[in-house]
Amino acid sequence: MADEGPRKGSVSALMGRTNGLTKPAALAGGPAKPGGTGGSRKLVIKNFRDRPRLPDNYTQDTWRKLHEAVKAIQSSTSIRYNLEELYQAVENLCSHKVSPTLYKQLRQVCEDHVQAQILPFREDSLDSVLFLKKINTCWQDHCRQMIMIRSIFLFLDRTYVLQNSMLPSIWDMGLELFRNHIISDRMVQSKTIDGILLLIGRERSGEAVDRSLLRSLLSMLSDLQVYKDSFELKFLEETNCLYAAEGQRLMQDREVPEYLNHVSKRLEEEADRVITYLDHSTQKPLIACVEKQLLGEHLTAILQKGLEHLLDENRVPDLTQMYQLFSRVKGGQHALLQHWSEYIKTFGTTIVINPEKDKDMVQDLLDFKDKVDHVVEVCFQRNERFINLMKESFETFINKRPNKPAELIAKHVDSKLRAGNKEATDEELERILDKIMILFRFIHGKDVFEAFYKKDLAKRLLVGKSASVDAEKSMLSKLKHECGAAFTSKLEGMFKDMELSKDIMVHFKQHMQNQSAPGPIDLTVNILTMGYWPTYTPMEVHLPPEMVRLQEVFKTFYLGKHSGRKLQWQTTLGHAVLKADFKEGKKEFQVSLFQTLVLLMFNEGDGFSFEEIKMATGIEDSELRRTLQSLACGKARVLIKSPKGKEVEDGDKFIFNADFKHKLFRIKINQIQMKETVEEQVSTTERVFQDRQYQIDAAIVRIMKMRKTLGHNLLVSELYNQLKFPVKPGDLKKRIESLIDRDYMERDKDSPNQYHYVA
């Protein structure tokens, strides 16, 4: 410390000079003010004759002091000198072009120190975790030391080093030395990487590990620029092997929901590792590796093993998780989409194809549609591809059984619109009809629906069984919107007929009041336009004279106002309200016309045989048997059948039940003849097929008339485009042959597959 004073003095003297110029305090920066005493003066500045020199041994002495400070930092001992003094010493040396030597000397000191650190790490006896802690301590010490060293040599770093692009900064030099002499050592690097992978492996197995240690070491590898080549490649390789084996094992051992939960958990864990200690650049390949091995390699197996069960059980959370996970991997959504479609087609086919399930088919379809809609809405995030393929799948399976679904959908609408349906409010009924219309869109045979819908609508209108005129018209509006005005024109005509009939009956009743005293029968007639309504087979029955007379009176009245028209009575559609006297008192019966004719016979006698009733009424055999069944074998047994039994035989006798009892005053006896029979179904379907033949013939003639000459394949293709119902190639061929036989068209003599229109 004895010579510290003189050193300070020389440094101070050196720093006090500025190129030999000392600026007097009296000098101003600008010219002298005008009006001042004395003349103008010149200031002459001369350069030093000799360049200022550092004191002898200054460089060596200063470096010795700096070297001592660096060694003290590296050995974690106290520094004898003030840091500001050391910084000033570096600046002094740099100002006198000693920078290259100073940089080399500093590098050598740092390199010697780093090289000396490698020896303890070459001991084989070190435990992996202990080794990692030791290397981490070494790294932390090195970083702390280089920060302090750089702060002392900052002037060197910001001048000489900055001006020489080939030289690394002092901090980068420290990283380079640590990388070259410690972490690039084969044994050290191997033990470091293996130790890190061991800790990560333990953590993946559920053990608690020192995450801060991992974070520090991986940050070290990243700073030393060996992270990607030395660690990441090996880490991803081990990750790949781990999850490949895990995926194979767990797919065998676990159910799909449990497996998907495990995949989600693994993805969350790996994402957390990236956030906590891995480099951000590892995130994409790491997550992709987990997704590929746990999901991508098992897409089909997962779907085959679990999708059907999840959908059957309506496991919404599990399906949501499946969709979210499958959306992460290439081809995942597509695979899910295809299996989803196959499930819909398979499950839907079981609903429509089995005749034993016809009773519940439409409700099952509606429930199934609600279910898949909910899955798309909640689980599949309203994905358009899933919505569109769901619609295609419904259309595919619902048409695997031609015609029947269309017929049953029409009947389902009838059950909802019929009076007595108490299960829904107006708003609920509207929603039900909207859902039914969705099913209606899927069916190809819309003409079959129309035929059965028209037949059921006729019954509702004629027997007064419609629950709501508003609901009826709402359904009509939906059909019109879906299929166009041509589809609903006849249905709308039926409503118009009913409204006109009401007006006609008002005038007829006024006419009857003016003509004579009212009779025992109050007649109401519905005038139906034959082209609008279903075709009904006329049945000639024996009406009571009073009914016949009233019919003639109405006929005369109507034709008097509408000359040129023809009336045809449809007895099968008639119904009446009869009054009857029993021992217990009076009752009223709401019955069909056929039931009316049978019951009126018992005004003339107490008992009749089946043959006698048949002769007296003229009702056809099968219709009469159903009528007598409703009167003698149903809940309201107005007649007593002898012998007892559910079936009506030829020799049966029927007696008036004078002891008939019922809690209601007006009793509706089930109108069995109004219920659809197998014959009616066949008849309705046959009429649809007949109408289709007419439409095919008309389309063929229309096309040939316009094109004159056309090949068979082109004609068939054109027909498929024009016809609005499903048709088989064989059916088209039959219609073409029929038109050729009827001379509407002819084959080309040289080319049988070519047709010519015959004018």
Swiss-Prot record:
Crosslink (Glycyl lysine isopeptide (Lys-Gly) (interchain with G-Cter in ubiquitin)) position: 33
Any GO MF annotation of the entry: ubiquitin ligase complex scaffold activity
Cross-link (Glycyl lysine isopeptide (Lys-Gly) (interchain with G-Cter in NEDD8)): 705
Compositionally skewed regions (Low complexity) per UniProt: 20-31
GO term, biological process aspect, one: positive regulation of protein catabolic process
Chain residue numbers at which the record places covalent cross-link Glycyl lysine isopeptide (Lys-Gly) (interchain with G-Cter in SUMO2): 8
GO cellular component labels: Cul4-RING E3 ubiquitin ligase complex; Cul4A-RING E3 ubiquitin ligase complex; cytoplasm; nucleus
UniProt modification remark: Neddylated; required for activity of cullin-RING-based E3 ubiquitin-protein ligase complexes. Deneddylated via its interaction with the COP9 signalosome (CSN) complex. (Microbial infection) Deneddylated by murine cytomegalovirus M48 leading to a S-phase-like environment that is required for efficient replication of the viral genome.
Keywords: Biological rhythms, DNA damage, DNA repair, Host-virus interaction, Isopeptide bond, Phosphoprotein, Ubl conjugation, Ubl conjugation pathway
Function: Core component of multiple cullin-RING-based E3 ubiquitin-protein ligase complexes which mediate the ubiquitination of target proteins. As a scaffold protein may contribute to catalysis through positioning of the substrate and the ubiquitin-conjugating enzyme. The E3 ubiquitin-protein ligase activity of the complex is dependent on the neddylation of the cullin subunit and is inhibited by the association of the deneddylated cullin subunit with TIP120A/CAND1. The functional specificity of the E3 ubiquitin-protein ligase complex depends on the variable substrate recognition component.
PANTHER family in alphabetical order: CULLIN
Protein name: Cullin-4A
